[in-house]
């Protein structure tokens, strides 16, 4: 009896912690973060080079005066690959620096400039020229599609926009359903604990497992959406330069923690009724003898 109660109380406590972690993850804006400080430094050094007529800038690593022939061959191959890549994707150093990349953090509802990463952005925000955060759209809008592109590229971008929009909707929708199901399961579990109903406790555990499943779907679609955005065509519009570091923030790990706690809570609550002994009635059962009921 004590083991069953302990499992039930532990499951309800873990489910409440899972609700808190998922709520924090939903309300925060640190699911995905980018750091463009190295990119800014490279572009500043690129813009500060000499631009005199007839002056050709050649970096030191392009002058292998003491290199062997094999190293020269490997270096020429690397230069050829880099040149082909820039011709294919139009991502030369000048092209990369002509586009402005900022250090941002993104959540389910908004995308914000990171605090203290760029003094120019901080001054613009302080003056009211730009807002720190912009809302993420969950409806289709053609305003974000560049106008000076060919028809085939524009069609590809439009299809990718729809696909990215569906992934964002699935991420937010399944995360909201996961929180609602876990909350409903916690209410059912509390009622089953107060009324000592094993069936309600078992149903609460199943709801916790279902909420964890929905949370898995939401997180997987979130990761798929981020990877899809990074691999969109054309790369010179949607890709990131190599010196911009990016990765998942603490909100994503908070959501994964809530997922794990909800699954553990579901396991505990479904196991609790089977551990508790079946209550025996003190009243003897009536039996039928010789056509009469005793």
Swiss-Prot record:
Q: Signal peptide position in this chain?
A: 1-23
InterPro entries found in the cross-reference section: PMP22/EMP/MP20/Claudin, T178A/B
| One Pfam family cited in the UniProt record for this chain | Claudin_2
Membrane-protein topology: Multi-pass membrane protein
Q: Name one GO cellular component term.
A: membrane
Q: Does the keyword Glycosyltransferase apply?
A: no
Subcellular location, principal = membrane
Keywords for this entry?
Membrane, Signal, Transmembrane, Transmembrane helix
Looking at the UniProt entry, the stretches that span the membrane are 172-192, 206-226, 252-272
Q: Where in the cell is it found?
A: Membrane
Tell me which family the UniProt entry assigns to this protein.
Belongs to the TMEM178 family.
Q: Kindly provide the name given to this protein in its UniProt entry.
A: Transmembrane protein 178B
Source lineage: Eukaryota, Metazoa, Chordata, Craniata, Vertebrata
Gene encoding the protein: tmem178b
């Amino acid at each position: 009896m004590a083991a069953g109660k302990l499992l039930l109380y532990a499951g309800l406590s873990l489910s409440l912690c899972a609700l808190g972690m998922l709520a924090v993850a939903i309300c925060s804006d640190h699911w995905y973060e980018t750091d463009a400080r190295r990119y800014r430094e490279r572009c500043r050094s690129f813009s500060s080079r000499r631009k005199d007529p007839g002056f050709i800038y050649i970096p030191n690593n392009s002058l292998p005066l003491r290199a062997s022939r094999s190293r020269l061959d490997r270096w020429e191959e690397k230069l050829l690959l880099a040149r082909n890549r820039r011709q294919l994707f139009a991502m030369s150093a000048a092209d990369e620096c002509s586009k402005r990349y900022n250090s941002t953090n993104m959540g389910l509802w908004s995308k914000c400039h990171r605090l203290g990463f760029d003094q120019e952005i901080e001054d613009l925000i302080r003056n009211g020229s730009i807002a720190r955060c912009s809302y993420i759209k969950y409806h289709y809008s053609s305003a974000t599609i560049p106008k000076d592109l060919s028809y085939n590229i524009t069609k590809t971008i439009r299809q990718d926009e729809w696909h990215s929009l569906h992934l964002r909707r699935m991420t937010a929708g399944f995360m909201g359903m996961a929180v609602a199901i876990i909350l409903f399961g916690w209410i059912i579990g509390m009622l089953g604990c107060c009324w000592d109903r094993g069936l309600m406790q078992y149903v609460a555990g199943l709801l916790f497992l279902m909420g964890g499943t929905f949370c898995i779907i939401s997180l997987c679609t979130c990761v798929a959406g981020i990877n899809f955005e990074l691999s969109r065509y054309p790369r010179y519009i949607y890709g990131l330069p190599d010196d911009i570091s990016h990765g998942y923030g603490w909100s994503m790990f908070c959501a994964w923690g809530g997922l794990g706690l909800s699954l553990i809570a579901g396991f505990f609550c479904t196991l609790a009724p089977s551990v508790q002994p079946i209550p025996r009635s003190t009243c003897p059962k009536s039996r039928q003898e010789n056509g009469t009921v005793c």
